[in-house]
From Swiss-Prot:
Post-translational modification: Phosphorylated by host PRKCA.
Segments of this protein annotated with the region Promoter-binding site: 251-258
Nucleotidyltransferase found in the keyword field: yes
Full protein name: RNA-directed RNA polymerase catalytic subunit
A GO cellular component entry from the record: host cell cytoplasm
Organism: Influenza C virus (strain C/Johannesburg/1/1966)
UniProt cross-references to InterPro entries, sorted A to Z: RNA-dir_pol_NSvirus (IPR007099), RNA_pol_PB1_influenza (IPR001407)
Keyword Phosphoprotein: yes
Top enzyme category: transferase
């Protein structure tokens, strides 16, 4: 029987299918569409892994609330993940950890964190990226979300005069008790006008900034809501995952908890956070070498490259509350209170379900979206898989949010979960001592490596099973299918491969070797600096580096359609360049972007090509390339470098400023987005600026430039430059008046042509 490959397209999105074929040289695939399915899957898994049915009705929200700790009922097939945490075991592990690190270890760490927190300014909260904004109920940049929250305090009670993080935290706790909260909100008013020519009625939507208010109950749900999105940029996966972003009311408290956890992680040698890069490699290397020192002559080690299944769904906020209570037991009352707020808020969190579920008919010709609020009403239309997801959770859902007392969502409390993981690596008991076995390892959030040490193979087996059992008690599930053991000093940890020493992983740097697409001047220098860095890190051998340099050159020429002057390649751009090259005597001085040849080799990677060719250039050509008054000359201090894995790296720009260092501007229009209300506010601000300027002419105010056409923008810029030139004495008053007249005529012509 032949298999028809096109059948695969019937039940899968084309976008998700394409994502499996993405190459490592390009950017990773982005996720599209609704994230509701992934969110529902996460919530259902969290409830399933609790392995219990003990529920009480929540007094605050009147929703059934499941218990996630100390109540394991279903003990069948414990190989599968379990998220039920035994609190007494957790406290026992924390005690062992403190004993090993020395008495007063936690107290000292919390004191360090306290001094930092007391100095912290609440503007530190603007550092995050996307944040859930409770006033507009959608995602905003962190700074905007913070501003809107501060505005809400101002509207309800008066201006917020605090400056430190603690004052902001106190205000947030006060807000949770207010009976009514007012905040700014953009409303659209529909106006009907008659068109004078056609006589038809025209509807226009006008955004108006108004003030809205909500009651205490509604605010409590909004404050505890965590928004979910589909995770972008995952390679080689058909199914997407949901990630979370909390609101500005939860953020300050989680920041405090993370500060405390960071101070602990810095002092634990098994922790892979918060350091990174070469510093992390050095830390791991010392852990591995110290293991060899601890072993006896008759013992041997096995390395296990571990994988935890469903890490986030099995982490419990209640367990974090107990752990933080133990960590802060000898500390000040202030820290005891502050650290307990974040886990309590997470114990009562609501998860936003997203845009809704997409349905289509059997022939895939029509599609419709059921919104999250109406999913209960149109249950009968759903496919079986959606029904099975939705029905068990129906009693926990209110409008478009779902009550989830247990489980964490991706990206929350990374440091604290590392402390929890390291506590299992510190475990030791009498039985292990009697058999002469022990274990140690490395932990970085949900990624870990285990070094199991024993004298024979049967004891090794027993040690690993013992470790697995200890982890199960506190909700960490080592996946037996995905974890593999190998000989000593051979493992992988957070995408770093270790074989006696760290082996380079060149695939991660591949996109960085290609042309970045900034401009002709920066691109080649940036690629050369990456090759140089990788040679220093032992990632590239000289021969591979030479190959990388040649590939870079070929791609650079193909991107900018510039080939060597004697290659006889035809093309629109090469025609223009060849005419210009005829006028130059010494052709060795030509830059690559002007049809020159490569002069750099491996030993001169750190020298930009402009410097190498400076002496060989014709004087006229040199003056043209390095002319600071040329409008194309521009210099940026930093440059963004893309990688196959992890965030964009920002490096120093080592390129020499030449006429090839131009910058292209993106034309961004706000007219057809829902940011028009911001523009309306900007216009009002502009009016005030103009009034102020008309009274105080010497005042130095930068008025915002609102909605403008390109023509208006050019005129504005020309006038500004002319005025500046006149002020410094570069042009005379008569010339300035002449320029003004020319611009006025151009404006007149432009308006008449309309």
């Amino acid at each position: 029987m032949e298999i028809n490959p096109y059948l695969m397209f019937l039940n899968n999105d084309v976008t998700s299918l394409i994502s499996t074929t993405y190459p490592y040289t390009g950017p990773p695939p982005m996720s599209h569409g609704s994230s509701t399915k992934y969110t529902l899957e996460t919530i259902k898994r969290t409830y399933d892994y609790s392995r219990t049915s003990v529920e009480k009705t929540s007094k605050v929200f009147n929703i059934p609330r499941r218990k996630f700790c100390n109540c394991l009922e279903d003990k069948d097939e414990l190989v599968k993940p379990t998220g039920n945490v035994d609190i007494s075991s957790l406290l026992g592990l924390a005690e062992m950890m403190e004993k090993r690190m020395g008495e007063g270890f936690f107290k000292h760490c919390v004191m360090e964190a306290e001094t930092e927190i007391l100095k912290m300014h609440f503007s530190r909260l603007t550092e995050g990226r996307q944040t859930y904004d409770w006033t507009s109920e959608r995602n905003m940049p962190a700074a905007t979300a913070l501003q809107l929250t501060v505005d809400a305090i101002k509207e309800t009670e008066g201006p917020f005069k605090g400056t430190t993080m603690l004052e902001y935290c106190n205000k947030m706790i006060e807000m949770l008790d207010w009976k009514e909260i007012k905040f700014k909100k953009v409303k659209t008013v529909v106006r009907r006008e008659k068109d004078k020519r056609s006589g038809k009625e025209i509807k226009t939507k006008v955004p108006v900034m108004g003030i809205d208010s909500i009651k205490h109950d509604e605010f409590l749900i909004r404050a505890l809501t965590i928004n979910t999105m589909a995770k972008d940029g995952e390679r080689g996966k058909l199914q997407r995952r949901a990630i979370a972003t909390p609101g500005m009311i939860v953020r300050p408290f989680s920041k405090i908890v993370e500060t405390v956890a960071q101070k602990i992680c810095e002092k634990l040698k098994e922790s892979g956070l918060p350091v990174g890069g070469n510093e992390k490699k050095a830390k791991l290397k010392t852990t591995v070498t110290s293991l060899n020192a601890r072993m006896n002559s008759d013992q041997f080690a096995v390395n296990i490259t571990g994988d935890n299944s469903k890490w986030n769904e099995c982490q419990q906020p209640e367990a974090y509350l107990a752990l933080l209570a133990y960590i802060t037991k000898d500390s000040s009352d202030l820290m005891k209170d502050l650290c307990s707020v974040a886990p309590v808020l997470f114990c009562n969190k609501f998860v936003k379900l997203g845009q809704g579920i997409r349905l289509s008919n059997k022939r895939k010709t029509k599609e419709v979206i059921i919104k999250a609020e109406k999913m209960g009403k149109y249950k009968n239309l759903m496919r079986e898989e959606y029904k099975n997801l939705f029905e068990p959770l129906e009693k926990y859902i209110q409008k478009d949010v779902c009550f989830l007392p247990g489980g964490m969502l991706m990206g929350m409390f990374n440091m604290l979960s590392t402390v929890l993981g390291v506590s299992t690596l510190c475990y030791m008991d009498e039985e292990l001592k009697a058999k002469g076995c022990f274990w140690t390892g490395l932990q970085s959030s949900d990624d870990f490596v285990l070094f199991a040490v024993a004298s024979n193979w049967s004891n090794i087996h027993w040690t690993i099973r013992r470790f697995n059992a200890v982890c199960k008690l506190i909700g960490i599930n080592m996946s037996l299918e995905k974890s593999y053991g190998s000989l000593p000093e051979l493992f992988e940890f957070t995408s770093m491969f270790f074989d006696g020493e760290f082996v380079s992983n060149l695939a991660m740097e591949l996109p960085a070797f290609t042309t970045a697409g900034v401009n002709e001047g920066v691109d080649f220098t940036a690629a050369m600096s990456i090759i140089k860095t990788n040679m220093i890190n032992n990632s590239l051998s000289p021969s591979t580096a030479l190959m990388a340099l040649r590939i870079c050159l070929q791609e650079f020429r193909a991107t900018y359609r510039v080939h060597p002057w004697d290659s006889r390649v035809k093309g629109g751009r090469m025609k223009i360049i060849n005419e210009f090259i005829k006028t130059i005597e010494n052709k060795d001085g030509l830059l690559i972007a002007d049809g020159g040849k490569l002069m750099n080799n491996i030993s001169t990677l750190h020298i930009p090509e402009e410097v190498l060719k400076f002496e060989k250039m014709d004087e006229q050509y040199r003056n043209r390339v390095f002319n600071p008054k040329n409008p194309f000359t521009n210099f940026d201090k930093t440059i963004d470098i893309f990688r196959a894995h992890g965030p964009i790296r920002v490096e120093e720009n080592e390129a020499v400023v030449s006429t090839h260092s131009f910058r292209t501007r993106a034309n961004r229009t706000l007219l057809n987005t829902d940011m028009r209300a911001m523009m309306a506010e900007e216009k009002r601000y502009q009016m005030v600026c103009d009034m102020f300027k008309s009274v105080f002419e010497s005042a130095d105010i930068n008025p915002p430039i609102g909605a403008m056409s390109i023509g208006e923008a050019i005129e504005e810029k020309l006038l500004e430059r002319a005025k500046m030139k006149r002020d410094i004495g570069a042009i005379e008053d008569s010339e300035y008046e002449e320029i003004k007249d020319i611009i006025r005529d151009a404006k007149k012509a432009r308006l008449e042509s309309r």
